[in-house]
A protein has these predicted regions:
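Short juxtamembrane and helix-loop transition motifs at transmembrane-helix boundaries
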Residues: 92-100
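Non-cytosolic membrane-interface motifs at loop->transmembrane helix junctions
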Residues: 126-138, 161-163
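Early transmembrane alpha-helices of polytopic membrane proteins
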Residues: 1-87, 101-115, 121-124, 137-154, ...
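Alpha-helical transmembrane segments
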Residues: 154-161
Length: 220
């Protein structure tokens, strides 16, 4: 009840939540990247985001910020859900299909937020399998959430062209999510260097590695 009241009645400033998520995400990535470089933990040549937050001390910052971001992201998903079901915004609550779609979208949004928390707390150097599991929840849940939200926007929110931008972003996210595991595994098995977190342009499968990272960043 207190959370519903906060979302539906005290909505001042809730529109800033997505902006705050983006700002904190940028801070987390850039801070960990430069800190990892100073500690000589990664290669400066376009590393994975997870590589930049896999060792102490940057892993502490990475984990803390991502945990905060995951909570804020969950609030974003929930606030959009409540906003959508508000009768004052012309959403037909008597239509079972719209309500069901909104709830399904919320579930995948929470899966995405939970996956981010798993990624934050299980670094790849600690428990690699759990880190991959969390990444799957994060990017997979986020991609499906984006597709459902795009459909809802197109089908039920009239006089809005924002669905076009959402459709483009949703397909970029889905396409990147599908390609990442394939190209990432190929690059990993073909790698012939000494430290997999310090890829160099001359390493074998370097182009595939960079291609994978581009899709990972696009998905993020």
């Amino acid at each position: 009840m207190p959370l519903d009241f906060l979302i539906t009645k005290c909505g001042i400033g809730l529109h800033l939540l997505p902006i705050l998520v983006c700002i904190l995400s940028l801070v987390a990535v850039t801070t960990c990247y430069f800190l990892s470089l100073t500690q000589d933990h990664i290669s400066p040549y376009f590393p994975y985001i997870s590589d930049a937050g896999s060792k102490i001390p940057e892993s502490c910052i990475f984990g803390q910020l991502l945990n905060i971001i995951s909570v804020l992201a969950g609030l974003c998903f929930y606030s959009w859900h409540k906003h959508l079901l508000d009768p004052s915004h012309k959403f037909n609550q008597r239509c079972y299909r719209q309500i069901k779609l909104a709830r399904i979208a919320l579930c995948f949004g929470f899966i995405c937020a939970f996956g981010m928390s798993v990624v934050a707390n299980f670094q790849e150097t600690a428990v690699w399998s759990m880190h991959l599991f969390g990444a799957g929840l994060l990017f997979g849940g986020g991609s499906i959430y984006a597709l459902i939200v795009t459909y809802i926007t197109y089908k039920y929110i009239v006089r809005s062209r924002i669905w076009i931008a959402r459709l483009v972003l949703a397909f970029i996210s889905l396409f990147s999510f599908i390609l990442q595991p394939t190209t990432g595994l190929i690059a990993r098995f073909m790698y012939d260097g000494d430290n997999i977190r310090k890829w160099k342009p001359t390493d074998k499968a370097g182009i595939i590695h960079e291609f994978t990272i581009i899709h990972r960043h696009a998905n993020s």
